[in-house]
């Protein structure tokens, strides 16, 4: 999702690199080393993780911030947790899902109560598969949907926090004299 979302948020003057991990254990195991090893003094790090089955998003974020602190570069890190899964972001913008999956009528479901506050949906990936008739596929679907997500969508607080944080980092980077 970040692959197709970041170009829509960031200025063309900012180059970025995405590093995918093989699940949350791999992320937690390698994150400190990856951040510490990055030699570019302008590098900033956006760490995005699903909450998955963990009951406490604050504890997950605190743990990741602790790992960032150990790297010595916490001031350059932005940690965001998708409540409960990344699919929550998509359920907050069914028009984007509809465009990505060529399902024009999907947006009409947005006013249903559960889709007005998607961060509260217990199993967003299951809900997304259900509402799309199994047309949504995690990797390909995420990439495609990211192209259409409305950046100012306020239905998902976790999505709004991600976009706001990335924009703040962008502002800080662009203010650094080169």
What are these regions (language model features)?
Residues 3-19, 25-44, 51-178:
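C-terminal accessory helical subdomains adjacent to catalytic cores in phosphodiester-
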């Amino acid at each position: 999702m970040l692959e197709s979302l970041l170009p829509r948020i960031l200025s063309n003057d900012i180059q970025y690199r995405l590093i995918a991990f093989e699940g949350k254990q791999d992320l937690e195991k390698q994150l400190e080393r990856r951040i510490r090893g990055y030699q570019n003094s302008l590098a900033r790090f956006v760490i995005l993780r699903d909450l998955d089955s963990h009951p406490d998003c604050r504890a997950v974020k605190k743990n990741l911030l602790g790992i960032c602190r150990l790297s010595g570069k916490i001031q350059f890190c932005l940690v965001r947790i998708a409540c409960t899964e990344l699919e929550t972001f998509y359920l907050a913008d069914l028009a984007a899902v509809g465009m990505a999956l060529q399902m024009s009528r999907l947006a009409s479901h947005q006013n249903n109560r559960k889709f007005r506050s998607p961060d509260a949906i217990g199993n967003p990936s299951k809900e997304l598969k259900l509402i799309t008739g199994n047309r949504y596929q995690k990797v390909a679907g995420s990439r495609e949907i990211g192209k259409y997500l409305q950046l100012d969508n306020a239905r998902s607080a976790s999505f709004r926090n991600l976009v706001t944080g990335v924009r703040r980092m962008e502002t800080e980077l662009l203010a650094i004299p080169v």
